[in-house]
Design a protein with these regions (language model features):
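N-terminal Rossmann-like dinucleotide-binding module
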Residues: 1-48
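Structured helix-beta-strand junction loops
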Residues: 25, 88, 114-115
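Beta-loop-alpha module in the N-terminal Rossmann-like domain of NAD(P)-dependent dehydrogenases
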Residues: 51-111
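Basic phosphate/pyrophosphate-binding loop/patch that engages nucleotide-derived ligands
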Residues: 110-118
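Structural signature of beta-strand start/N-cap positions in the alpha/beta core
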Residues: 5, 29-30, 49, 65-68, ...
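Low-complexity, intrinsically disordered short peptide segments enriched in small/polar/basic residues
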Residues: 1, 11, 63, 114-115
Length: 119
């Protein structure tokens, strides 16, 4: 099986937990992280030995070395951040909750279908 090259959007507590989980999976490689500023992206990347460090979510979403992105931001930002990544052609894992209401979830799934990427 090919390795999935992951990016993590956000650098908070849930991002740390996800990075730890990825570290034990044989078919996953943590390639990039994105934050709203370079300092937090660098600190997260140092902790998890990540090469690509992005000072914006937009930059992470367009990283050609990333196949899938885990959205680790507050619930209220899940829709915007997930759609940003989906529009860039990335598979997205966004959870707990996917969105803050059904309308947002439907919009997210609509973009995923339109772009033919996994959500």
């Amino acid at each position: 099986m090919d390795r999935i090259r992951w990016g993590i959007l956000g650098t908070g507590r849930i991002a740390q937990s996800f990075a730890e989980g990825l570290s034990i999976l044989p078919n996953a490689e943590l390639r990039a992280t994105g934050s709203r500023n370079q300092q937090t992206a660098d600190a997260f990347a140092e902790r998890w030995n990540i090469h690509s460090r992005h000072a914006s979510y937009e930059s992470l979403a367009t990283d050609p070395e990333v196949d899938a992105i885990y959205v680790a931001t507050p619930h209220s930002a899940h829709m915007a951040n997930s759609i940003l990544c989906l529009e860039a052609g990335k598979a997205v894992l966004c959870e707990k909750p996917l969105a803050i209401n059904g309308k947002q979830a439907r919009e997210m799934t609509s973009v995923a279908r339109e772009k033919n990427v996994l959500l």
